[in-house]
Amino acid sequence: MSLIDPRAIIDPSAVLADGVEVGPWSIIGAGVEIGEGTVIGPHVILKGPTRIGKHNRIYQFSSVGEDTPDLKYKGEETRLVIGDHNVIREGVTIHRGTVQDRSETTLGDHNLIMAYAHIGHDSVIGNHCILVNNTALAGHVHVDDWAILSGFTLVHQYCHIGAHSFSGMGTAIGKDVPAFVTVFGNPAEARSMNFEGMRRRGFSEDAIHALRRAYKTVYRQGLTVEQALAELAEPSAQFPEVAMFRDSIQSSTRGITR
């Protein structure tokens, strides 16, 4: 049974599963689907087409599924898809996609989106990511699993943030960030790898040492990207983690943060 505050406004076409809670003065628009156990706090606005999975919690004053401000957007039907077990804190804004890209903005599972963060149109957020307060993603940004973007991080459109990477507070990212890499500054510069995060997630010391050597190959030996990738071919065959690091560099379309 859902628990809906009588002061909430819910469009008749919205679909709410069992166990959904909706707080006072929240507005749930047409085309919104909410999975079981999800809690919508007070003063939240949800606009469709938006599908929200199970056991999420969305806090007050968040705007989720609003039209994109992209000037090319002319009212086409686009969507937002949110997975399960996400926490979306106060004042977060998440926009739907555009037909010029995927027509969809996607947020995976088990993410923490902290207060006043923004996720722009057509962005793709993986699983177990953390966007700290006031982080802002422009349109078309991809953030891979377990990435952490510290407070006030700004990410340029079309950037790709690799898995297990980390940005320091106030970092301005204009190029792709390879997997595992730690970046700081405005403009962002690569400083090291997220070794502490790796240890917390149970990476073996052998894998961490291999990644340390791989980082030095790319960032400390004065090699071109092509030369560094060639040097990483052998350790990539031995360590999947190094292969992930190498692949994130090889697939970069904007160039990597150096």
Curated annotation (Swiss-Prot):
One of its GO terms (biological process) is lipid A biosynthetic process. GO terms for cellular component: cytoplasm; membrane. Gene3D superfamilies: Hexapeptide repeat proteins (2.160.10.10), Udp N-acetylglucosamine O-acyltransferase, C-terminal domain (1.20.1180.10). Pathway: Glycolipid biosynthesis; lipid IV(A) biosynthesis; lipid IV(A) from (3R)-3-hydroxytetradecanoyl-[acyl-carrier-protein] and UDP-N-acetyl-alpha-D-glucosamine: step 1/6. Signal peptide: none annotated. Belongs to the transferase hexapeptide repeat family. LpxA subfamily. GO terms for molecular function: acyl-[acyl-carrier-protein]-UDP-N-acetylglucosamine O-acyltransferase activity. It is an enzyme of class 2 (transferase). Keywords: Acyltransferase, Cytoplasm, Lipid A biosynthesis, Lipid biosynthesis, Lipid metabolism, Repeat, Transferase. The gene is lpxA. Pfam families: Acetyltransf_11, Hexapep. It is found in: Cytoplasm. Its EC number is 2.3.1.129. It catalyses: a (3R)-hydroxyacyl-[ACP] + UDP-N-acetyl-alpha-D-glucosamine = a UDP-3-O-[(3R)-3-hydroxyacyl]-N-acetyl-alpha-D-glucosamine + holo-[ACP]. This is Acyl-[acyl-carrier-protein]--UDP-N-acetylglucosamine O-acyltransferase. InterPro entries: Acetyltransf_C, Acetyltransf_C_sf, Hexapep, Hexapep_transf_CS, Lipid_A_LpxA, Trimer_LpxA-like_sf. It comes from the Bacteria. PROSITE patterns: HEXAPEP_TRANSFERASES (PS00101). Involved in the biosynthesis of lipid A, a phosphorylated glycolipid that anchors the lipopolysaccharide to the outer membrane of the cell. It comes from Pseudomonas fluorescens (strain Pf0-1). Homotrimer.
